[in-house]
Amino acid sequence: MLNVLFVCSQNRLRSPTAEQLFADWPGIETASAGLNHDAEVPLGPELVEWAGLIVVMETRHREKLRKRFKAQLREQQIVCLNIPDDYDFMDPELIQLLRQKVPQFLPDIAEAR
């Protein structure tokens, strides 16, 4: 089972959309968090350690993640989607972008069954 963590700034729009969108993907568990201290679910060391794959929305998220959680980052793959903070929660355009960009990093559906 691959633990996939989706990260944005506030954990209000992009990362929870991704978490919900891929929650039923075979072979993975999903979670989401935000890097800002006032995020809905603030990112903590436990979530970073839990994750096998960390998917960030912007390059600044990757840099913050690497600085703040240096001790917890070991073998995790960190992927940046380059999706700006221009979308609402479950925005159809955001969903389309996520469907285009994320599956290449997830276990193949056929292999997971």
Feature locations, PLM:
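Short polar/charged helix/loop
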Residues: 1-113
